[in-house]
Amino acid sequence: VLSAADKTNVKGVFSKIGGHADEYGAETLERMFVAYPQTKTYFPHFDLQHGSAQIKAHGKKVAAALVEAVNHIDDIAGALSKLSDLHAQKLRVDPVNFKFLGHCFLVVVAIHHPSALTPEVHASLDKFLCAVGTVLTAKYR
């Protein structure tokens, strides 16, 4: 459960990300594909080269989902309900991959905003990303 301080910290980080969300989404995916190559199996039709149009497009979707979750931080489940259905019923993505994606997003934020990622903010952002992952896998059962 995200505390009031967690919510403030997460919103603060996303305000710093601002117009870079799409870029960070693509960078997160690229990092995940390199660090966790097994995740590539869900994207057999993608050009997985650095800067590919497909990675940029999917990175934009990832970023949009995270921004949507931040904008509805008190109802992440409601905000991401359709996306949860898609991942559980159609895409059937292994739930561990959301943890991988979250970790890679944390790394991207740390690279671009090192001073913003204090231990407290890091913990809040990690809790938020875990909450998003939990929502996206809730309908698997």
UniProtKB/Swiss-Prot annotation:
One of its GO terms (biological process) is hydrogen peroxide catabolic process. Red blood cells. O2 binds at residue 58. Residues 1-141 form the Globin domain. InterPro entries: Globin (IPR000971), Globin-like_sf (IPR009050), Globin/Proto (IPR012292), Hemoglobin_a-typ (IPR002338), Hemoglobin_oxygen_transport (IPR050056), Hemoglobin_pi (IPR002339). Involved in oxygen transport from the lung to the various peripheral tissues. PANTHER family: HEMOGLOBIN FAMILY MEMBER, HEMOGLOBIN SUBUNIT ALPHA. This is Hemoglobin subunit alpha-A. It comes from Branta canadensis (Canada goose). The lineage of its organism: Eukaryota, Metazoa, Chordata, Craniata, Vertebrata.
